[in-house]
């Protein structure tokens, strides 16, 4: 009996130790991010007016969920840091409203959200429908557009591939990637499959429902696993589509001016690189060692 109790106690200790290790690992991933968020020095309790931001948290490292957290704090990523910074500069209480990517645009168009901040690129169609902010730069990996696929199919997607006949290529509905597939791959025989949620699309890729998925390179890095890999196929991307923008309602010209001022201030302060690197670590795209951060979330300089 004592032997059984000893074994049971040992098992409990092992499970407890594993849980503690997992918790510590999760906390270590967020150190640089938490430091960047704290540096913004934003206290929502100071403000009365609310800034509602539509966001689609399925696009790591730009925006994604940390399931260990609750409420608005569970939504993390580069665009969350940016939204927090903008809210502070505007003197407003930030409210994140999570929804699908295309619903973000509908929310702004209908006036149900003040801003849509969710890795949006400039497109001619969006310029007709919304007021569009100045660019913000979320790392070079967000300007490159790529196909991800499975290990078994990787050899099919070479950098100079010209025949996509019979291949199903996924993209998020309403995204720049949808536009690129329509313009560059459908004429070469590809069949476009649209998804509301990029994580659902990644599952469809892993299970063989589609042959490849069009994503921003940085997002592709976050989706890589034992099954999914980055392919060698890159889209040709016009300069006008590079970098990101914030979408506003056509009637909000005064708000646009304030948002652009906040973006200019963030750019001048050199915040974007720091934010993006912190989010790469958080999303496990890169390690702290790879990017040169210590255990306290500080950038190591020589």
Question: What spans do the regions from the language model cover?
Answer:
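Bilobed "Venus flytrap"/periplasmic-binding protein-like clamshell domains
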Residues: 57-60, 72-88, 120, 142-198, ...
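Acidic, polar ligand-binding/catalytic clefts
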Residues: 84, 93-163
């Amino acid at each position: 009996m004592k032997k059984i109790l000893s074994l049971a106690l040992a098992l409990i200790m092992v499970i407890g130790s594993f849980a503690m290790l997992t918790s510590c690992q999760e906390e270590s991933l967020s150190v640089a991010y938490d430091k960047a968020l704290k540096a913004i020095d934003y206290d929502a309790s100071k403000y009365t007016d609310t800034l509602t931001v539509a966001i689609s948290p399925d696009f790591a490292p730009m925006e994604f969920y940390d399931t260990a957290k609750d409420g608005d704090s569970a939504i993390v990523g580069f665009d969350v840091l940016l939204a927090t910074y903008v809210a502070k500069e505007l003197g407003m209480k930030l409210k994140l409203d999570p929804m699908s990517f295309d619903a973000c645009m509908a929310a702004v168009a209908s006036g149900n959200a003040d801003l849509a901040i969710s890795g949006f690129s400039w497109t001619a169609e969006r310029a007709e429908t919304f007021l569009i902010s100045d660019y913000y730069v979320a790392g070079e990996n967000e300007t490159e557009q790529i196909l991800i696929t499975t290990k078994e199919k990787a050899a099919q997607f070479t950098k100079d591939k010209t025949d996509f006949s019979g291949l199903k290529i996924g993209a998020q509905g309403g995204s720049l990637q949808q536009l690129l597939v329509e313009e560059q791959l459908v004429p070469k025989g590809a069949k476009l499959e649209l998804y509301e949620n990029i994580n659902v699309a990644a599952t469809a890729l892993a299970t063989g429902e589609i042959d490849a998925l069009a994503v921003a390179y940085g997002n592709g890095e976050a989706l890589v696993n034992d099954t999914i890999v980055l392919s060698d196929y890159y889209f040709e991307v016009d300069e006008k589509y590079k970098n990101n923008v914030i979408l506003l309602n056509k009637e909000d010209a005064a708000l646009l001016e304030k948002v652009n001022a906040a973006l200019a201030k963030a750019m001048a302060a050199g915040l974007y690189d720091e934010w993006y690197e912190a989010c790469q670590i958080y999303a496990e795209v890169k390690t702290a060692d790879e990017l040169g951060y210590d255990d306290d979330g500080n950038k190591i300089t020589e």
